[in-house]
Amino acid sequence: MAHPTQLGFQDAASPVMEELLHFHDHALMIVFLISTLVLYIIIAMVSTKLTNKYILDSQEIEIVWTILPAVILVLIALPSLRILYLMDEINDPHLTIKAMGHQWYWSYEYTDYENLGFDSYMVPTQDLAPGQFRLLETDHRMVVPMESPVRILVSAEDVLHSWAVPSLGVKMDAVPGRLNQTAFIASRPGVFYGQCSEICGANHSFMPIVVEAVPLEHFENWSSLMLEDA
Amino acid sequence: MTDEGGKNQGMKVMGILDIQNTPCARESILHGAGGSLVAGLVHFLATSRVKRSFDVGVAGFMLTTLGSWFYCRFNNAKLRVQQRMIQDGIKNKVIYEGTNLDPTQKKTGDQ
């Protein structure tokens, strides 16, 4: 999860997010080199005593500063497109979950085998137990089996919402009347937090998402318990 | 304040590039620094032009850093693919051992 004064991404919990992190490192290194070059040129321009008022054209430098940016853009675009298509792959999900956005909570439906559905409200600050995270905890978590492809169908019942979990590399708009699909694989067990990412009214900041990835047998036990309680 | 997974607060070059926690970053910057020094020094020794040698040094830094970065990241990506394949292979072996889906069993069965 996020920690105070954090600037970078959260640790990746899915293969797609790992790839996104690597691509980010790649793009940042290129940005760093360009920034270094520009800084050097600024210092050189400011500190030079040379002035030439009669330059009319200069073919060589024009060729360099046309071709070089094009090459840099290609070096950034190729891995970017690779990840873009990687993120669109849906590889035979083991489980499908519907995430419905409401004002101001999420509801989850597991309807592959039985009809399991529940609402997920934020735990108010005054009701937090010691060690729990303010504005991030929910009363019911969306539990998924780890290392299994999971498909999420996202929609909304009233206004626009957005279902986002940064450490899984997932964000999908919840549009009323539309069904959007996304998928992820949780590569390790853990609890992953997210927040609604589309302005949806007064309590937009208070409808978090909590995904708990557990081994398959724990997931089966949890779903049995939830069905009994329902 | 605790950091995620015990990571150190990395050193950020120019405030953006976290050298300690980004794979290959530290090696690339060090190679770049070395390449810059060598290129600038050689040019100066050959031409005795200070300013132009600095320009050559900066160009050398950029090219060496970029080259080292791409080479290291490419190898890193290959290792990650191999690691994932090995992980999947171990998982499949544990799951399918003793069943008719066991890949090792298929090979002995063909003999």
Swiss-Prot record, chain A:
Read off the PROSITE patterns from this record. COX2, COX2_CUA, COX2_TM
- Positions annotated to bind Mg(2+): 198
Q: What is the membrane topology here?
A: Multi-pass membrane protein
User: Which residues bind Cu cation A1 per the record?
Assistant: 161, 196, 200, 207
Q: Which CDD domains match?
A: CcO_II_C (cd13912)
**Claim: Magnesium is one of the keywords in the record:** yes
Q: Which residues cross the membrane?
A: 15-45, 60-87
Cofactor note, please?
A: Binds a dinuclear copper A center per subunit.
Q: Which residues bind Cu cation A2?
A: 196, 198, 200, 204
State which ranges are Mitochondrial matrix (membrane side): 46-59
- Report the cofactors: Cu cation
Q: Name one GO biological process term.
A: ATP synthesis coupled electron transport
Alphabetically ordered keywords of this record: Copper, Electron transport, Magnesium, Membrane, Metal-binding, Mitochondrion, Mitochondrion inner membrane, Respiratory chain, Translocase, Transmembrane, Transmembrane helix, Transport
State the reactions this protein catalyses: 4 Fe(II)-[cytochrome c] + O2 + 8 H(+)(in) = 4 Fe(III)-[cytochrome c] + 2 H2O + 4 H(+)(out)
Give the similarity note: Belongs to the cytochrome c oxidase subunit 2 family.
Q: Please explain the role this protein plays, according to its UniProt record.
A: Component of the cytochrome c oxidase, the last enzyme in the mitochondrial electron transport chain which drives oxidative phosphorylation. The respiratory chain contains 3 multisubunit complexes succinate dehydrogenase (complex II, CII), ubiquinol-cytochrome c oxidoreductase (cytochrome b-c1 complex, complex III, CIII) and cytochrome c oxidase (complex IV, CIV), that cooperate to transfer electrons derived from NADH and succinate to molecular oxygen, creating an electrochemical gradient over the inner membrane that drives transmembrane transport and the ATP synthase.
* Official protein name in the record: Cytochrome c oxidase subunit 2
Question: In the UniProt record, what gene is named as encoding this protein?
Answer: mt-co2
